[in-house]
C-alpha cells in the first residue's frame, strides 16, 4: 500500500510525522495522530481516527511508528481519491445538476462517439442501478454501481 506513494509524498509525510514525534523516538501517540493528519489536508472523524489507530497499532501500546503511519496515510488517500473520482463521474452524467441521473442524461453521455449503446442497453443500465425504482439513478445508487465490481 505505502509503495504506491511518491517520494515527494513520503518526504511530506516524514516531515509531518517528525513534527509530532517530540522525543524523536520514531513513534507518535494516538492523540497526536489527528493533528498530523489534519496538517496533511485530511479531515478524519474521531471514529475514523480510532479505526485507523486500531488497524495500525498492532501491539496496542498507543503509539504508531513511521512505516505504520505511511500505510495508514496511503489507505486514507486511496479512499479519498476514489470518492472524488466517483463524485466527478456522477457530475458528468448529471447534466442538469439535480442530483439524479435520468435515462435521458445517461443516454446522452453513453451515445456520444466511442460509447455507442442502444436505447435498450441504456434502459437496462438504469434498471440495474435504480435501487429505489424511481426511474433514475441518485448519487448513492451511482456509488453502489461504481463500487460493486
Curated annotation (Swiss-Prot):
GO cellular component: cytoplasm
Occurrences of domain EF-hand (ranges): 8-43, 44-79, 81-116, 117-149
Binding site for Ca(2+) 2: 57, 59, 61, 63, 68
Residues that, per the record, bind Ca(2+) 4: 130, 132, 134, 136, 141
Amino acids binding Ca(2+) 3: 94, 96, 98, 105
Function field: Calmodulin mediates the control of a large number of enzymes, ion channels and other proteins by Ca(2+). Among the enzymes to be stimulated by the calmodulin-Ca(2+) complex are a number of protein kinases and phosphatases.
Similarity comment text for this entry: Belongs to the calmodulin family.
Protein name: Calmodulin-2
Organism: Branchiostoma floridae (Florida lancelet)
Underlying gene: CAM2
Amino acid at each position: 500500500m505505502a509503495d504506491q506513494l511518491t517520494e515527494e509524498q513520503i518526504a511530506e509525510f516524514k516531515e509531518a510525522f517528525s513534527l509530532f514525534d517530540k522525543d524523536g523516538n520514531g513513534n507518535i501517540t494516538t492523540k497526536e495522530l489527528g493533528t498530523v493528519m489534519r496538517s496533511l489536508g485530511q479531515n478524519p472523524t474521531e471514529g475514523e481516527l480510532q479505526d485507523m489507530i486500531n488497524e495500525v497499532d498492532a501491539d496496542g501500546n498507543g503509539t504508531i511508528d513511521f512505516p505504520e503511519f505511511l500505510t495508514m496515510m496511503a489507505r486514507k488517500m486511496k479512499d479519498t481519491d476514489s470518492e472524488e473520482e466517483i463524485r466527478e463521474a456522477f457530475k458528468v452524467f448529471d447534466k442538469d445538476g439535480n442530483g439524479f441521473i435520468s435515462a435521458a442524461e445517461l443516454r446522452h453521455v453513453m451515445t456520444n462517439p466511442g460509447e455507442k449503446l442502444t436505447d435498450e442497453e441504456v434502459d437496462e443500465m438504469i434498471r440495474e442501478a435504480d435501487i429505489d425504482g424511481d426511474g433514475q439513478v441518485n448519487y448513492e445508487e451511482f456509488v453502489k454501481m461504481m463500487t460493486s465490481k
